[in-house]
Amino acid sequence: KALLNPGEEVIILAPYFVEYKFYIDNHGGTVKEVSTREDFSLDLEAIAKAIGPNTRTIIINTPNNPTGKVYSKKELEQLGDLLGQKEKELNRALYVISDEPYAKISYDGIKVPSIFKYIKRSILVTSHSKDLALPGERIGYAAVSPQMEDAGHVMEGLVFCNRTLGFVNAPALAQRLVTPLQRETVDIAAYQEKRDILYENLTRMGYKMVKPQGAFYLFPQS
């Protein structure tokens, strides 16, 4: 609601977290699905074709649920360049919402790039239910890129929208609890061990899948 006028389009990249469609519909937006490539990397050509005069926002999720894909610096940089071009063509602001509850859960030395370095109109949304292993505890934060010209206006909208959620707002105690834990995360060694065991055994059995780079999901071909 902080970004959309009723009926404006939100691009989501398939495969995606299934609840995105309900969030968008609940806030008056129109869903536009764009498939990723076979390895689940961004299909920039398909994204470019999907962006039109009614597009307002793209949602990305990295590391991805359900694929475990981590978008690279190059992909994010190219996406930022594409959006800059499209903003000039369409004469309208285009925003990226980066959903990153798994940002601290990545494997094999892979680091999740900061969206703020590559996309000017970006909003980072995260939840500590994953990186602090607090399943179902919806405590997190939203952050707006300092490069965004209308950052103050967007933040005001986000704050107001959060207030309208009422009883689901984080209590003061939870806010105090997570503040000193911003640089902490669960020990991901157990997650990586489980990923390796499942990946190695399932591929040995003949299943085909892209090896997850983060999160805790496997997405085999059916």
Segments predicted by a language model, with ranges:
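Phosphate-binding glycine-rich loop
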Residues: 1-9, 23
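Active-site pre-lysine segment of PLP-dependent enzymes
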Residues: 25, 32, 41-54, 66, ...
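Conserved core segment of the aminotransferase class I/II
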Residues: 120-192, 196-205
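Short beta->alpha connector loops at strand-helix junctions that form conserved
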Residues: 14, 29-38
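Conserved PLP-binding catalytic core of the aspartate aminotransferase-like
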Residues: 38, 191-192, 196-199, 204-222
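Short beta-strand segments
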Residues: 59-61, 95-100, 126, 211, ...
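Conserved coil-to-alpha-helix start sites within the AMP-binding
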Residues: 16-20
